[in-house]
From Swiss-Prot:
It comes from Arabidopsis thaliana. Residues 27-162 form the RanBD1 domain. The lineage of its organism: Eukaryota, Viridiplantae, Streptophyta, Embryophyta, Tracheophyta. Gene3D superfamilies: Pleckstrin-homology domain (PH domain)/Phosphotyrosine-binding domain (PTB). Residues 1-30, 159-228 are annotated as: Disordered. Interacts with the GTP-bound form of RAN1, RAN2 and RAN3. It holds the Pfam family Ran_BP1. Ubiquitous. Preferentially expressed in root tips and gynoecium. One of its GO terms (cellular component) is cytosol. Its main location: nucleus. This is Ran-binding protein 1 homolog a. InterPro entries: PH-like_dom_sf (IPR011993), Ran_bind_dom (IPR000156), RanBP1-like (IPR045255), RanBP1_RanBD (IPR045256). It is found in: Nucleus, Nuclear pore complex. The gene is RANBP1A. Residues 14-24 have a biased composition (Acidic residues). Residues 1-13, 179-228 have a biased composition (Basic and acidic residues).
Amino acid sequence: MATNEPEHEHRDEEEAGANEDEDTGAQVAPIVRLEEVAVTTGEEDEDAVLDLKSKLYRFDKDANQWKERGAGTVKFLKHKNTGKIRLVMRQSKTLKICANHFVKSGMSVQEHVGNEKSCVWHARDFADGELKDELFCIRFASIENCKTFMQKFKEVAESEEEKEESKDAADTAGLLEKLTVEETKTEEKTEAKAVETAKTEVKAEEKKESEAEKSGEAKKTEESGPST
């Protein structure tokens, strides 16, 4: 005669099966260990002197129209050692470089016609890995940010111009000093040569006089004849 198992035994078996699926708390080591990799941006030796969100455009000469370069943050970065300042802009999501060039003497920036939030400038840009002449237009969220950008741009360009003028003045002073030293040395050599020539002439004259005296004495001796 078959007997039915008690209901509580079924419950015990179900609970035991459930317990087997429970987390035991044991830690499982990952099959592949990923190491942290230091990410470098090339900006480690520079300090940001300006940092503004913006959208950048470049003028496509072939299509004769403005094309968006990217939206992100534009920075003026000052090198800690050389003091040179470059303009760098990266796309906010991909961090791809949109613009990368030094701000140099003679560069200028001006407001984009009809839009006080935008400004334009020419630059020799290196964003694509090679120098290219680019015409950029940058747009900001506010007029104030645009003015701040333009003011900083002009300050940097003027500062570079002053540095070049100072360097040119120093180079000119150094050249003049070198020329003065060379002229002095030339004059000294000329004077020394003149003195040496005078000495040589004096010696030659003295030699002639000495020879003349000797010749005169010899002639007198011949004229007087032998003594008797």
